[in-house]
C-alpha cells in the first residue's frame, strides 16, 4: 500500500491541538480592512476550532495529522 498524500494547502491552514481537536485561522483578514471595525478585526485574530461537521473531511485530506 503506497503512502497517502497530504494536501499541502490544507497542511498550512490547520494545526492539531494538544487535545486532538483541529485549529484554524479566521477568514476576512487579508485586505479591505478599513471598513471593518477595530473590535471585529481584533476578534478575527483569534484562532478558532474547526466545526464538527467538517472534521471528517479535514482528517481525510490530512492523513498524518
Swiss-Prot record:
Record-annotated membrane-spanning stretches: none
Biased composition (Basic residues): 10-26
Molecular function terms, GO-annotated: structural constituent of ribosome
Alphabetized InterPro entries for the sequence: Ribosomal_bL35, Ribosomal_bL35-like, Ribosomal_bL35_CS, Ribosomal_bL35_sf
Name of a matching Pfam family: Ribosomal_L35p
Coiled coil location: none
Matches recorded under SUPFAM superfamilies: L35p-like
Keyword Ribonucleoprotein assigned: yes
Keyword Ribonucleoprotein in annotation: yes
Domain of life assignment: Bacteria
Biological processes per GO annotation: translation
GO cellular component, one term: cytosolic large ribosomal subunit
Region (Disordered) residue spans: 1-29
Similarity remark: Belongs to the bacterial ribosomal protein bL35 family.
NCBIfam families given in the database record: rpmI_bact (TIGR00001)
HAMAP family registered for this protein in UniProt: Ribosomal_bL35
Name of the featured protein: Large ribosomal subunit protein bL35
Amino acid at each position: 500500500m503506497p503512502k497517502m498524500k497530504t494536501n499541502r494547502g490544507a497542511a498550512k491552514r490547520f494545526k492539531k491541538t494538544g487535545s486532538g481537536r483541529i485549529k484554524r485561522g479566521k477568514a476576512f483578514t487579508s485586505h479591505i480592512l478599513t471598513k471593518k471595525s477595530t473590535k471585529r478585526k481584533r476578534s478575527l485574530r483569534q484562532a478558532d476550532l474547526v466545526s464538527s461537521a467538517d472534521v471528517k473531511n479535514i482528517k481525510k485530506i490530512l492523513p498524518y495529522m
